[in-house]
UniProtKB/Swiss-Prot annotation:
Keywords: Lipoprotein, Myristate, Phosphoprotein. This is Protein FAM131B. Residues 323-332 have a biased composition (Acidic residues). Residues 1-22, 95-114, 222-332 are annotated as: Disordered. The modification Phosphothreonine is found at T316. It holds the Pfam family FAM131. The modification Phosphoserine is found at S47, S114, S117, S295, S297, S313, S317, S318, S322. Belongs to the FAM131 family. The keyword Translocase does not apply. InterPro entries: FAM131. GO terms for cellular component: cytosol; nucleoplasm. Residues 101-111, 272-281, 288-302 have a biased composition (Basic and acidic residues).
Length: 332
């Protein structure tokens, strides 16, 4: 007990330098073992920072080296050395006659290749690869251009002939249909085919006696237009017209003759020859069509005009009347 107490006492009464040294050597270890919560996080933080810095440095060096090996170096060789190697090998020139001593030529080529540096060897390899790619690309482009020319020639030749034949066939069919149309149902058939248009919905009604049916002009005019136009007596002599029977076909649009449907054989005297030869303005042509129709529909005989309008209305409304009758019977 005395010895231990004397040791502790002597250690406490030592000079300051020795006390600090013993504190670092002994007491410091005791503190590190006791207060682990305050020292271990510092060590952990230092190790993490060092590891992250080393990892970043190694990663940056690795990335820079890989970029230099895979991007910078081939680009530099592609810009300068590849062209030089292509010119040095003499590609694109006519092949020379092979020498008799092939083994010696192979040996010289091998020696020349072995004397090259690593960059020149890589450039030579890249030049060969680029040559093969160029040959393949040129071949593909030649084939594709030939196929494109064939397709363009076929596409320009076929539509012209097809369109011409289709248009000609449609024209012939329309002409045959017009020639074979029944004469008795001429107003209804021509209106249904779109040859003439109706100016109003009640143009075919029999109650309105003042409506004017004008096949020559292709329209049907109401009483308002009839009132605005001058009468036949005010305009002067009658316009030329030729007679057509009910069995004869109607003239086409723009013809110089008129036809009265439903009226038997009507013979009208032609006007003077100079009236036929004189050119007419568009307004005068419309007036002439109206005057021709007025001359064909006599006003002094109301019974004939009533019969004419009734026949025309019966032709167009026969289908509607039959449908109404069937609907009424079904309702009853």
């Amino acid at each position: 007990m005395d010895s231990t107490s004397s040791l502790h006492g002597s250690s406490l009464h030592r000079p300051s330098t020795e006390q600090t040294r013993t504190d670092f050597s002994w007491d410091g270890i005791n503190l590190s073992m006791e207060d682990t919560t305050s020292i271990l996080p510092k060590l952990k933080r230092n190790s993490n920072a060092y590891g992250i810095g080393a990892l970043a440095k190694s990663s940056f060096s690795g990335i820079s080296r890989s970029m230099k090996d895979h991007v910078t170096k081939p680009t530099a060789m592609g810009q300068g050395r590849v062209a030089h190697m292509i010119e040095w090998q003499g590609w694109g020139k006519t092949p020379a006659v092979q020498p008799q001593h092939s083994h010696e030529s192979v040996r010289r080529d091998t020696d020349a290749y072995s004397d090259l540096s690593d960059g020149e060897k890589e450039a030579r390899f890249l030049a060969g690869v680029m040559e093969q790619f160029a040959i393949s690309e040129a071949t593909l482009m030649a084939w594709s251009s030939m196929d494109g020319e064939d397709m363009s020639v076929n596409s320009t030749q076929e539509p012209l002939g097809c369109n011409y034949s289709d248009n000609y066939q449609e024209l012939m069919d329309s002409q045959d249909a017009l020639a074979q149309a029944p004469m008795d149902g001429w107003p209804h058939s021509y209106v249904s085919q779109g040859m003439y248009c109706l100016g109003s919905s009640d143009a075919w009604e029999a109650s309105d006696q003042s409506l004017i049916a004008s096949p020559a002009t292709g329209s049907y005019l109401g009483p308002a237009f009839d009132d605005s136009q001058p009468s036949l007596h005010e305009m002067g002599p009658s316009q030329p017209a030729s007679g057509y029977s009910a069995l004869e076909p109607p003239p086409l649009l723009g013809g110089d003759t008129d036809w009265a449907p439903g009226v038997g054989a009507v013979d009208l005297a032609r006007g003077p020859a100079e009236e036929e030869k004189r050119p007419l303005a568009p307004e005068e042509e419309e007036d002439a069509g109206c005057r021709d129709l007025e001359s064909l529909s006599p006003r002094e005989d109301p019974e004939m005009s009533t019969a004419l309008s009734r026949k025309v209305s019966d032709v167009t409304s026969s289908g509607v009347q039959s449908f109404d009758e069937e609907e009424g019977e079904a309702n009853n």
